[in-house]
Regions:
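N-terminal catalytic cores of peptidoglycan-degrading enzymes
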Residues: 1-78
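Basic/polar, cationic surfaces and motifs that engage anionic cell-wall
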Residues: 1-8, 14-19, 92-160, 170, ...
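Short, solvent-exposed loop/turn segments at the edges of secondary structure
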Residues: 20-22, 51, 80-84, 119, ...
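Structural recognition of the beta-strand scaffold that forms the well-ordered cores
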Residues: 24-28, 54-58, 63-67, 84-89, ...
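Cell-envelope and extracellular/periplasmic
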Residues: 30-31, 80-94, 111
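Residues that form or flank phosphate/diphosphate-binding pockets in enzymes
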Residues: 35, 97, 173
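Short, well-ordered coil/turn elements that cap or connect secondary structure elements
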Residues: 51, 59, 119, 184-186
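Solvent-exposed beta-strand motifs enriched in subsets of small alpha/beta binding domains
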Residues: 157-194
Length: 194
């Protein structure tokens, strides 16, 4: 996952540089259908009196922008900002449903933050859970949130490997010769005695 830093300048309102120890992750939607991650980052940077910010923005195409360091407070959920890493997600759907690329990037980002700060899945929340605000709008619905929450907090299944056996020989010398032919063809090969 690539994270682009576009840190908001330190200031009184949207990046006070107050320290915070991450204990939970809060998912938001931008509330601006079709807006890009770049546009929101620019808004945060140029509107210091807006009193709004977030640590991360996930774009429609899955790009990730960091606006506030993880260990600083961002202003995104009224009085629930201390200890919270906020993630704004961009969207194209008028109902607020996230794009697949956004969900994939959100999954990577959330798993990274969970591992880095030892945050349990139960502490990955919606803005709605913190303050009652209808955000992210499409995912205020409990079933939709449960499905999204499962996707963004689930670790990928361990990759299974399958072994292909080629040949069985009664002579070790013949087995070694054949293994060498397989290696010359560009494949890994070894001889096992059974």
């Amino acid at each position: 996952m690539q994270i682009t830093d576009r840190l908001i300048p330190r200031g009184k309102y949207n990046r006070p540089a107050a320290k915070s120890v991450p204990k939970r992750i809060c998912v938001h939607y931008t509330g601006d259908c079709g807006a890009s991650a770049d546009r929101l980052a620019l808004f945060f940077t140029t509107n210091s009196a807006a009193k709004t910010s977030s640590q991360y923005i996930v774009g429609i195409d899955g790009e990730v922008i960091r606006c506030v360091p993880d260990n600083e407070i961002a202003y995104a959920a009224a009085g629930k900002n201390n200890g919270t890493i906020h993630i704004e997600v961009c969207y194209k759907d008028k109902a607020g449903k996230f794009e697949e690329k956004s969900i994939s990037a959100l999954n990577e980002l959330v798993l990274y933050l969970m591992e880095r700060y030892h945050i349990a899945a139960k502490n990955v929340l919606r803005h709605y859970d913190l303050t009652g605000k209808l955000c992210p709008a499409y995912y205020v619905d409990a079933a939709r949130w449960a499905a999204l929450h499962e996707r963004i907090t689930a670790k990928p299944a361990a990759q299974k490997l399958y072994r292909v056996q080629v040949g069985a020989f009664s002579s070790r010398a013949n087995a070694e010769n054949y293994a060498e032919q397989v290696r010359r063809a560009g494949f890994g090969a070894f001889v096992v005695e059974t």
